Amino acid sequence: MIRKIIFFLFFSIISLAQQIELKSIEKTIIANGQNYTTTLSQSYDEKNKKLEVLYIEKGDYPFGTKEIIQFDTEGKKELSKEKFKYNISTGNWNKDYKSVTTYEKNKKIEETYMAEENRWTGYMKYESENTDNSETFIIYNFKNKKWNPFSKTYTLLNENKKNNIIETYNWDINKQKWDLESKSVYTYNQEGKLEETVDYKKENNWIADQKLKYYTDDKGNQVYSNLFFQNGKWIEQDKTISEIDKVNNKKVAITQQLNKETKQLENTRRFIQTYKKDMLEQEIEYFWDKDKKEWYKKYEQNLSYDENKNLIRKQAIYDDDSGVQFTYKFDKNGNNIEILLEYLNSQTKLWGAHEKIEYLYDLSIMKDKVLDRANINDENEISVNLILEKKYYIYDGKEWILKEKSRYLYDKK
């Protein structure tokens, strides 16, 4: 028994010390009877805190990009980034884009450069500064061999760190100073919920231009109202009323817009969501037919789940009798192993297979234990374990044809 405990502890220490990094994604594309391969890889120099991301396309017309990212001594903050493109004629890497970032207390400054004749030329500069109660963001452009102010956004925060006032400025070249162009003022209720936003524009004087109101009506419905200031008064342009039907587990939102001829708000859209145990089961969208004075269904979506609350089917049907359906399969661990795409035949009313994706996982490794420094995996698959392979098929009416295959390679240290 003691030996088993010692072995378990020893194995646990090794497992904790082991680091798993995603190193590359190799994709094979099958088209016109030929295979084309692409490789997206990343390598990190721990000593120099430098990350290199390489993308290579092999085939009749080779193509490639390279990105080199330099971090600070702790390996956390990005200091610089350089991008290069592969020149098939010369076999060299040509400069494409560069950014240099510096940090000063609460300030972050990023200078960007574009390549002209393989030489770096200033492009844009971004300067952001945060304090306890404000945020400032300034944009510069590069002209006449120097950085020139272009625009500025200043945000004043309230005690809850929410927007209180937002001001936007443009740089006046002649006066060499910032010119305030517009501003927005936010108002909250005692519970800290947004109640009103008023936008102001500058003419001879500052005048209110647009107002967004959020409130609860006497029936308990949530209301969003959009108003414009015209001819000395506020005119409601559109309004959305959201009702929660707790008895039938429904959320109903009705949108109305101003009829410029009658000067009255008229129905335009109705959106109904139905829930079961807090899980969305159905969405139906209706539009208002002005001539028939009635709602017509534009779109309906139905969703189904398994006992683990995984979405296993999403079906959408449109007003032209077309439809699309996704079916998801999961393994016992909760990994999505297959996605099937089907289209609805408006004539036969039958679903026909069209595309399919299959995933393969390493069930011994958890997904959240994998380090992907450059985020080269953008698949966003629903999974618990580490992804090893992805296959993409299309259906030709008789059989499934493999069109793409991706392999995910890792480095275990």
Briefly describe each language-model feature range.
Residues 1-21:
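Bacterial Sec-dependent N-terminal signal peptides
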Residues 18-413:
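Buried hydrophobic residues that stabilize the cores of well-folded domains
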